[in-house]
Amino acid sequence: MDPRSLHAWRTTRRDLLRLTGASIAAVVGTSLSGAHAQTAYPTRPLRLVVPYPPGGPTDTAARIIGAALSERLKQPVIIDNKPGASGSIGIEQVVRSAPDGLTLGVLANPTLMSPLLGVRQNFDVQHGSTAIGMAYEIPLVLMVNEKALPGVTNVRELVAAAKAAMSAGKPLSYATPGVGSFSHLITESMQSLTGVEFAHISYKGSAPAIADVLAGHVPIMFSDMIAALPHVKAGKLRALAVASAARVAFTPDVPTLKEQGFDLQANSWGGIVAAPGTPAPIVERLSTELKVVLADAGVKEKMLAAGCLATWSTPAQFQQHLVSDYARWGKVIQERRIKPD
């Protein structure tokens, strides 16, 4: 080989080896950096935004989950109550936070449905956040005041009583925590299913609504289990049915709506979301830890005591749930012509 050609070949070979080594080092370095970032997360305390006041069902569930996540992540999980606009104010703070997985939020069904009821949101409630996963469900129970409706012991008897009251021109009334609440929407769905019409009495929250049902001023209410359970257990209100797919541990003797011939089911729910653009490794870590936490026997027991069912789903499943529930209840709101207060 010509000396000049030999020199050129050696130079090219040396340069190729140098470039190959640098490329390998870069790939390895990137992989190690990514692995380190995943294992290092989180390096600071997390904030879990609860977009409702302290003491409610979402707040109760969030505090149980937050405490368990803190143990798993080895960092404090600080509960930050930011109520307002059916939860939209708090979730907007999450959506506009840095996508580092350090600010999380509890997105519950009232917030999902609020734009359907005229609440203005500055974000896309269906797609504007990063879904981490479903966290809990709260069974709904259909209950009546026994003194107001003494002969009603199941849903068929309630429907019969309602039809008789309609024929007499005095429809039975039902209480809800407010227009567009889950209690309101499922009762409207039941009316469509059965052909009965109740008179809606709207209150500002579960407490005053249940108080009037206890007093007999309003005989009927679909309530979340957290608010209803003490009165059902005390025998002050009669539980006719649960709206979940299966009977619940709190009231094992109370049949589902479907068991009684009414194909209607729905639970109130809440899930964990993060800011849009949160890196996939962080989402995966949070989803995995949430799954472990919700499977823990101690967490399940605490959730049950609070009237909640620990319910995990993948990020993709929770995202799909947001889309399907928005469509389902949006149809009810439209068909029943439900208007905001």
Task: Provide a role label for each language-model segment.
Residues 1-15, 19-30, 36:
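N-terminal secretory signal peptides
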Residues 126, 137-138, 228-295, 324-327:
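C-terminal lobe and pocket-closing loops
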Residues 46-48, 55, 62, 79, ...:
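Residue-level signal for nonpolar/aromatic packing positions in well-ordered secondary structure
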Residues 43-45, 192-196, 233, 256, ...:
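An extracytoplasmic/periplasmic, membrane-proximal ligand-sensing/linker region
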Residues 37-127, 170-171, 179, 195-219, ...:
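N-terminal (or domain-start) structured segment
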Residues 96-102, 116-208, 269-302:
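Hinge/capping helix and adjacent helix->loop/strand transition within the periplasmic-binding protein
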